[in-house]
A protein has these predicted regions:
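N-terminal G-site of the GST-like fold
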Residues: 1-120
Length: 122
């Protein structure tokens, strides 16, 4: 049996943006916004920023069920965040969810508005 060398992490890790396939750009190892772009805001206090992914659908179903039950405070505006185009890295979205993941909810019924992100938290 031969001994293998122990792994030693690099002192400086460099991210190679070019590595990866079509969906490699939906995640990145750096924090913060990659570009300036404000998020749209509709007429309801709850603003949902999401996409039709399983986690995004969970929140939409929840809000639709609450609205169907007559809970007026659950009325919301939904906005598409196209993760394939990197919209989750916009300055507006990162202000709501610093993790740059969908879904994210912004509740304007409080001052300042309350940020809620990750489907389980919403």
């Amino acid at each position: 049996m031969s001994e293998t060398a122990a792994y030693a992490p690099a002192k400086v890790w460099t991210w190679n943006k070019e590595v990866g396939g079509k969906f490699a750009a939906i995640n990145r190892p750096t924090a913060g916004a990659s570009h300036e772009q404000a998020l749209p805001v509709g007429k309801h206090p709850l603003q949902l920023y999401s996409l039709g992914t399983p986690n995004g659908v969970k929140v939409t179903v929840l809000l639709e069920e609450l609205v169907e039950l007559g809970i007026i405070d659950a009325e919301y505006d939904a906005w598409l965040i196209n993760i394939q185009d990197g919209e989750q890295f916009s300055s507006g979205f990162v202000e709501v969810n610093p993790n740059s993941k969908i879904p994210a909810l912004l509740d304007h019924s409080t001052t300042p508005p309350t940020r809620v992100f990750e489907s389980g938290a919403i």
